[in-house]
Amino acid sequence: MNPMLQVRQPRLAELVAAQLRERIVSGRLVDGDLLPKQEDLGQQFGVSKPTMREAIRILESEGLIEVQQGRFGGAVVHVPKVENIAVSMALVLETNGVHLPDVGVALQAIEPSCVRLCAQREDRLEAVVPVLQNLHDHALAAVRDDERVVALSREFHEALAELCGNASLRLCAGALERLWTAHEGSWAEQASYGPGFPELRIRHEALDEHALIIERIAAGDAEGAAEAARAHLGTSQTYALHRAGNPIVDVPLQRRLLNSFH
């Protein structure tokens, strides 16, 4: 047989992993489900313990399950989330020595596109504006609470990606947003113990810019909304980077953020 025509046969462990993966992505296994013991799973699939162990390792490497140790441990299902993408992205960026401003530039290119799509949604007044307005109202109420107002502001930006209506862009932009969120959250936590936090006037100015974005989305002004987002990012990132410096993208920060969702 021509070697070029030979197709590698999947290992048995890969076939078992594929069946379990299908159960997860189809929703038959949901986030937080505890899989049966490996011995019981092996009997279900008719495979040996080493084969079952390897199948579990495959799924663990994909982030679909987490093996927890201890008396009440086991393999716990984790449905893929945008936070998983952010962790993988952070790993690649950190390995290549990429600094946080690089992520900022990417956000300046991609977030306005999300905002434009939000403004173009026919159901924006029902599906988009109320969510953004609710986050904005809570941020206004918490404007004197250093860490809380930063967290709500980051939720606002993440919502712009989440609500854009395009699944692929939502994942790409959402991962970038969470890369930035992890670093900005860390900076905010440290700054809350010193003089590094922006004064009240600057916080109100940032929230006024959020309000303008909401207003233009509600009006269906796609280009105006995108421009407002672009201008706001330029201002807010300049301030954040001035305070945070020029750090390399940090994987542990991403893992901490991911764990907060589990």
Predicted regions and their residues:
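A ubiquitous short alpha-helical element
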Residues: 4-5, 95-102, 118-123, 140-144, ...
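Short, highly charged C-terminal tails/helix-capping segments
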Residues: 195, 245-258
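Short linear motifs at protein or domain termini
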Residues: 1-109, 113-116, 120, 247-250, ...
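Short alpha-helical segment immediately N-terminal to, or the first helix within
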Residues: 45, 215-216
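Conserved amphipathic alpha-helical segments that form helical-bundle/coiled-coil interaction surfaces
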Residues: 103, 107-190, 209-215, 224-238, ...
